[in-house]
Curated annotation (Swiss-Prot):
Entry EC number(s): 2.7.7.7
Classification via Pfam families: DNA_pol3_alpha, DNA_pol3_finger, HHH_6, PHP
Top-rank taxon, per record: Bacteria
CDD domains: DnaE_OBF, PHP_PolIIIA_DnaE1
Protein name, per record: DNA polymerase III subunit alpha
Top-rank EC class of the record's enzyme: transferase
Subunit and partners: DNA polymerase III contains a core (composed of alpha, epsilon and theta chains) that associates with a tau subunit. This core dimerizes to form the PolIII' complex. PolIII' associates with the gamma complex (composed of gamma, delta, delta', psi and chi chains) and with the beta chain to form the complete DNA polymerase III complex.
InterPro entries: DNA_pol3_alpha_NTPase_dom, DNA_pol3_alpha_thumb_dom, DNA_pol3_finger, DnaE2/DnaE/PolC, DNAPol_HHH, PHP_dom, Pol/His_phosphatase_N, Pol/histidinol_Pase-like
Subcellular location as annotated: Cytoplasm
GO cellular component: cytoplasm
Family indicated by similarity: Belongs to the DNA polymerase type-C family. DnaE subfamily.
Length: 1181
């Protein structure tokens, strides 16, 4: 049956924040309405075109490719046109035109093409004049029919019979205003009319939710009237509705069908399109063979020298390595992948030549001898027992995939090299699309609907966070009853008056969730093509970059024929680079190229579980595993990196027990001992599964890789087929059927979690390198770690704690010592563990420094880590450099006014100055932080006045100097706790004083432990403890058991984390769980191989914990002065009301009568605070 109507103006969510339809929904709507075809015409881009085509074809629909573009007709005349691809030429021109809208240099007004662009790329395109948004409609709305006719003729001249007048009926006044004139011009010029309807949502009832989407786009609330809106009729109308709507213009309906019949191209998959690496003189095949053989000779020469291999053994090794090399080369060349290897080898060789650190390998590519020979990887595959077939299987053809790790700071240099070599038009990044996920969509919708912030924050906090698998709103409502109840008016807050609005927020969020919100770029993916990218895919260019971005997501870029190369920036390589640079400045060279992995100091450190900063070994559980494993070889580190994952983790105890000869390894069969010996009988690696199948059942390594894949996927049919092959092969090898089946079942269980050994070995080497640096050069290593985490105050806290544990001094921020980044001062003297962090004095005893005083460092900074100015909130490393350069040029700062006078006023603002003061940067220059904070407005005014006078020719030293004494306002001194929280606000950590320090004496009386007690002094069998801490961070997360909250707290010794799984605990103590709260928590404690786990059961404030306890204090003064101090303090704390928490007895020793002690029980009651116990502890018991 001939179709009745085809929608030609359907937009998807790739029209960012304009359409509420996904590609799948568009196709589903067309299919359910029995349309044989559907046109996708997104606003300004073709980002969804390939996804749309494949989805439509899969559903048996004809995809029609269109795009809505802005055309610049004149200097200030812009209008829309809908262009549709008639054939392949048209589609390629559509790619070029849509790409031009992003790659032009004049995008200030809007993304557009020029009229001349349409003339150049019109072939194969059908054009629809976009009614009221098109040039003809705009002219008619301006009552200029003559100009409308002129532009209609121009477009008709360009497109001929491929030009249509689009007509819509959304019941809008502007449409009705121009309709008659519009139809008349179409008739006069014989331009066919085509009926369309804007399709932005699926049904009329979605109009309100779509309106919210438009508000999100505009950044306004629904109450704001002067904003963009669309008609409620912009939904997917059925053919019947459209026919009825245009019953007076049946030809306009018929033309949708006619237009569809003119289109016969759909975007499709393409074979890989790589640049040709061949030259006139040599083919890719010959070139890779030549380079690989030369490279292997060089690798073996280095190997023989570094490993002291005897001359008589070298020839046999050469034979073995070259046999493997030739085997791999045959496969690579037969698969036509020589060019791929040569491209990767080229940019890695360039990187190494330029001194850019490249990872030893990543993924299965490290299993290739060819890759090793071409310098793509740095692991000897034969030495480490790695398999080529795991990377490139001759029995299952698929593209090889090298993921390359580069030093994070220099990754861009490598990309720029590739662009210069192959051409800017052939190299591009890959686009990614940010979606409206649960937390974000609730916040957006709540803001648009004017839901009070506290309710929006409450709702988003109920949605668990998962970085790997974001939780959908629907899933969150199933798993968090409180979220589902919130819409009904129930929850932690009193929702009276807001229940209906909250329900509307959640309902609307459910509709909008998952739509595309914006575009970004893939973190690592780079494509390199053999032709201009725009010939294959739409391209995009960010306004802030000149590099092309492929307009398809990674999945569809590869389907289109583009080959992705992952240029990954690995932060750890930057740590290694920076650490080696610091050491080189001290004349210390570290060469990892010839490392033998046998440094005792490194393994001794790891055996103690000191994994902070060590690649892969930083988690609590991993550190505990290191302590139990006691690694003594690189193979232990490789195995542990592979085992420490859900599933294989259960085999860690077996591995450890067998290593320490507490248990006999089970090799399953004597033939398998050589394969499983290095892992003590535990099947850890996927390569072991392949070897087992080869040795036991006669598989080729390629076929064994297919077996491994089947075991990993656990597809029943494939597993049954593979088991039959395995058993048959094992029987042929004189193994009984029952034993073969048993071994297959055992291996299948392990294989489901098997890890790629090539990847494990590559990353194990990086782990060893970082451990080596930390063990041998801890200060330089930790500074390198710190400098990559300037904005991560949790990490800074962690690394500084590690430095303190390693006896490294910490210099608090100091405007005359600190630089933009953390820095280290080396010393020949070993700093003992007992050394405490160097901190500024915070009392009134600091000497005030006048403007003329020569400032000297307040401590010996040799062997210390100096806190970075750039790690203070609101302060950038660039500002730190400005300060450092000024110090180098004109010496140390002598006062706060000297600082103000010497730095440009534009570089200093109120927040920056506030945080510099709060962090203690000026403590050496001025002893009263509170006074400086109160004086900020005057300091800034002084800065402006001083520099204005300097810039004028009327600068008066006397006049400005007369201002100086009046800058600082009078102020009291802040107490220690206030100063501590100043530091927390400025740096996210407590560096010179912790708020709980003064409570340590009373905590001992209250049986409240500190974190050091958890590791050292906890009696066996303890399962419940009381801890005190300051809440530093609060997160809501999701586990298999549902939502839970994690708190990060700190005490004077360390930071610690605890979990809250009970909704009742959350509800009862929500008022105590704010960041910066001082709390006592009663919690369950579990010690296992994952480390220490704390689960909160109840909370109390510090004050309540103290005040709810009655203390019986006994004092033993040794002289009159001590007695006077006791009595003075107690007199100030008399409180005979119910709030009291202490009684006191004083024992006086007679000076005349031996062994005579007078006991005086005071009748009064006292209300003591935390600091009181600290003061009195020297006199009491």
């Amino acid at each position: 049956m001939r179709p009745e109507f085809i929608h030609l103006r359907t937009q998807s969510s790739y029209s960012f924040l304009e359409s509420a339809l996904t590609i799948e929904k568009v196709v589903e709507l067309a299919s359910s309405n029995k349309m044989p075809a559907i046109c996708l015409a997104d606003k300004g881009n073709l980002f969804g075109s390939l996804e749309f085509a494949l989805c439509a074809v899969k559903k048996g629909l004809q995809p029609i490719h269109g795009v809505i573009l802005n055309i610049k007709y004149d200097i200030d005349i812009f209008a829309q046109i809908l262009l549709i691809a008639k054939d392949e030429t048209g589609y390629k021109n559509l790619l070029k035109l849509s790409s031009l809208t992003f790659t032009k240099n004049d995008r200030k007004i809007c993304d557009h093409i020029d009229f001349e662009d349409l003339i150049e790329y019109q072939e194969g395109l059908i054009g629809l004049c976009c009614y009221t948004d098109g040039i003809v409609g705009k002219c008619l709305l301006a009552r200029n029919e003559e100009q409308a006719m002129l532009f209609a003729r121009k477009l008709q001249e360009i497109l001929g019979d491929r030009f249509y007048f689009e007509i819509m009926r959304h019941e809008l006044p502007e449409e009705q205003f121009i309709e008659d004139s519009y139809i008349r011009i179409a008739a006069e010029l014989a331009i066919p009319l085509v009926a369309t309807n804007k399709v932005l949502f699926s049904e009329k009832s979605m109009h309100d939710a779509h309106d919210v989407l438009l508000c999100i786009s505009a950044g306004v609330t629904k109450e704001y009237l002067d904003r963009k809106t669309v008609s409620e009729n912009c939904y997917f109308k059925s053919p019947h509705e459209m026919i009825e709507l245009f019953s007076d213009l049946p030809s306009a309906i018929q033309n949708t069908v006619n237009l569809r019949e003119r289109c016969y191209f759909a975007a499709h998959a393409n074979p890989p399109m790589l640049p040709n690496f061949a030259t006139e003189n040599i083919s890719e095949t010959d070139l890779i063979k030549k380079d690989a053989k030369e490279g292997l000779l060089a690798r073996l020469a280095t190997k023989f020298k570094s490993e002291n291999i005897a001359l008589e053994n070298q020839e046999a090794l050469k034979t073995e390595y070259f046999a493997r090399l030739n085997y791999e080369l045959d496969i690579i060349c037969n698969m036509n992948f020589a060019g791929y290897f040569l491209i990767v080898s080229d940019f890695i060789k360039w990187s190494k030549k330029e001194g850019i650190l490249v990872g030893p390998g990543r993924g299965s590519g490290a299993g290739s001898v060819v890759a090793w020979s071409l310098l793509i990887t740095d692991l000897d595959p034969i030495k480490f027992g790695l398999l080529f077939e795991r990377f490139l299987n001759p029995e299952r053809i698929s593209m090889p995939d090298f993921d390359i790790d580069f030093c994070q700071e220099r990754r861009e240099e490598v990309i720029n090299y590739v662009r210069s070599k192959y051409g800017n038009n052939r190299v591009g990044q890959i686009i990614t699309f940010g979606k409206m996920q649960a937390k974000a969509v609730i916040k957006d919708v709540a803001r648009v609907l004017s839901l009070p912030y506290k309710f929006a924050d409450y709702l988003t906090e109920l949605v668990p966070f998962s970085a790997v698998n974001p939780v959908s709103l629907e899933q969150a409502m199933r798993e968090v009853p409180e979220l589902a109840n919130a819409a009904k008016g129930n929850g932690l807050y009193n929702l009276d008056g807001e229940a209906e609005l909250i329900k509307l927020v959640i309902d609307t969020s459910l509709i909008l969730e998952g739509l595309h919100r914006h575009s970004s770029t893939h973190a690592a993916g780079i494509v390199i093509a053999g032709t201009d990218l725009v010939d294959i895919v739409p391209v995009y260019k960010d306004a802030n970059s000149d590099m092309l971005i492929v307009g398809y997501s990674m999945k569809y870029s590869e389907i289109a024929g583009l080959i992705k190369f992952d240029f990954l920036g690995l932060q750890t390589l930057t740590v290694i680079t920076d650490c080696k640079k610091l050491l080189k400045e001290q004349g210390i060279e570290v060469d990892f190229n010839n490392m033998t992995f046998d440094d005792n100091k490194t393994y001794q450190m790891l055996c103690k579980g000191k994994g902070v900063g060590v690649f892969q070994f930083e988690s609590i559980g991993m550190k505990d595993a290191l302590r139990r494993l006691k690694p003594d070889s690189i193979h232990d580190l490789i195995a542990l990196g592979a085992l420490y994952r859900p599933g294989p983790m259960e085999n860690i105890p077996t591995y450890i027990a067998c290593k320490h000869k507490l248990q006999q390894p089970d090799y399953l069969h004597e033939l398998l001992q050589p394969i499983l010996e290095e892992t003590y009988g535990v099947v850890i690696y996927q390569e072991q599964v392949q070897r087992i199948a080869q040795v036991l059942a006669g598989y080729t390594l390629g076929a064994a890789d297919l077996l491994r894949r089947a075991m990993g996927k656990k597809i029943k049919k494939e597993m049954e087929e593979q088991e039959e092959i395995f058993v048959k092969g094992a029987i042929a090898n004189n193994i009984s059927e029952s034993q073969a089946k048993s071994i297959f079942a055992t291996v299948a269980k392990f294989a489901g979690y098997g890890f790629n050994k090539a990847h494990a070995a590559s990353y194990g080497v990086i782990s060893y390198q970082t451990a080596y640096l930390k063990a041998n050069y801890p200060a330089a290593f930790l500074v390198a770690c710190l400098n990559l985490e300037l904005n991560n105050h949790d990490k800074i806290n962690l690394f500084l704690q590690e430095a303190k544990d390693n006896g490294i001094k910490i210099i608090a921020p100091n405007i005359n010592i600190s630089e933009g980044y953390f820095s280290v001062k080396f010393s020949d003297t070993v700093i003992p563990h007992s050394v405490k962090p160097v901190i500024p004095r915070l009392d009134r005893g600091i000497q005030k420094i006048s403007k003329d005083t020569v400032v000297k460092p307040r401590c010996d900074i040799a062997g210390a880590i100096i806190f970075a100015l750039g790690a203070i909130k609101g302060v950038t490393p660039n500002f730190g450099k400005l300060v450092t350069d000024e110090r180098k040029a004109r010496g140390a700062f002598k006062s706060i006014t000297d600082f103000i006078e010497r730095l440009p006023p534009k570089s200093i603002n109120s927040k920056l100055l506030e945080n510099l003061i709060k962090s203690g940067c000026f403590d050496e220059l001025h002893d009263n932080r509170l006074q400086l904070l109160s004086s900020i407005p005057k300091l800034l005014s002084y800065s402006t006045a001083y520099h204005e006078e300097q810039e004028s020719n009327q600068f008066s030293l006397i006049k400005v100097s007369s201002l100086s004494p009046t800058i600082l306002v009078s102020s009291d001194y802040a107490d220690k706790n206030t100063l501590a929280f100043y530091e927390f606000e400025a740096m996210g950590l407590f560096i010179s004083n912790h708020p709980l320090t003064e409570y340590q004496e009373i905590f001992s009386r209250l049986n409240i432990l500190n974190t050091a007690d958890l590791h050292n002094n906890l009696p066996d069998g303890t399962n419940r403890v009381n801890l005190a801490g300051v809440i530093q961070k609060k997160d809501s997360r999701m586990s298999a058991r549902g939502r839970f909250v994690t708190l990060v707290l700190s005490d004077p010794e360390n930071i610690f984390e605890l979990s809250i799984f009970s909704e009742e605990v959350l509800k009862d103590y929500v008022h105590l769980l704010d960041v910066k709260s001082l709390v006592v928590v009663n919690c369950d404690i579990v010690k296992d191989e994952g480390g220490i786990k704390l689960t909160a059961k109840s909370f109390s404030s510090i004050e309540d914990a103290i005040n709810n306890k009655q203390f019986e204090l006994q004092f033993y003064p040794q002289n009159h002065e001590e007695l006077r101090q006791i009595v003075t303090l107690l007199a100030a704390r008399i409180n005979n009301e119910d709030q009291s928490n202490a009684k006191a007895t004083i024992y006086l020793q007679s000076a005349d009568v031996k062994n005579f002690v007078a006991k005086i029980t005071l009748p009064e009651k006292f209300l003591l605070q935390g600091q009181d116990f600290e003061i009195l502890k020297g006199y009491s018991k």
